[in-house]
């Protein structure tokens, strides 16, 4: 069990465990606004009132990243600390994949505002510059069902989760 996580076979568990190292306070401090998350933060009341969370975002995902961008634009400062969030239960792999998919639609809808704030958008831009978007779509398309089956199954792969995110985003872009 890690920080209250108790489902070692679950995809969300694996993702959160993998994220602990990648998103330490030290790592997040290197790009403080790109790494902002709303699941565990404190903010000055006046700053929050002056820059509330966006009410136009109705779908899951990226609201916290956009809020971090708003704080950066406002000249606010962020101090990242290691203060892990505990999870007693996590959603099923299927529910997590549904949330990931919804967040990719949100990312697409706000892609212009999120430029420079999303590693996924950075990767897609690199594929575009190298004229590989079509090739990547063609490679992903026949594998999409198998990848989804892995991600919703008993032994999901974090590598395939990354492939799923890129491939699904490319399909949304069509």
List the model feature ranges, each with a label.
Residues 74-112:
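Active-site donor/metal-binding and catalytic loop motifs
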Residues 59-67:
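Acidic donor-binding loop at a coil-to-helix junction in glycosyltransferase catalytic cores
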Residues 1-13:
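Conserved donor NDP-sugar-binding/catalytic core segment of glycosyltransferases
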């Amino acid at each position: 069990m890690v920080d209250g996580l108790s489902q070692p076979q679950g995809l969300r568990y694996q993702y959160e465990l993998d994220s602990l190292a990648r998103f330490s306070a030290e790592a997040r401090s290197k790009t403080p606004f790109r790494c902002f998350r709303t699941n565990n933060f404190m903010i000055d009341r006046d700053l929050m009132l002056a820059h509330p969370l966006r009410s136009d975002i109705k779908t899951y995902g990226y609201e916290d990243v956009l809020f971090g961008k708003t704080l950066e634009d406002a000249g606010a400062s962020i101090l990242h600390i290691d203060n892990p969030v505990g999870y007693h239960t996590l959603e099923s792999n299927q529910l997590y994949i549904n949330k990931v998919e919804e967040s990719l639609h949100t990312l697409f809808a706000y892609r212009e505002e999120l430029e420079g704030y999303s590693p996924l958008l950075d990767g897609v831009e690199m594929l575009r510059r190298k004229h590989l978007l079509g090739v990547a779509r063609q490679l992903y398309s026949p594998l999409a069902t198998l990848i989804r089956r892995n991600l919703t199954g008993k032994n999901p792969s974090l590598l395939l989760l990354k492939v799923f995110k890129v491939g699904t985003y490319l399909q949304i872009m069509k």
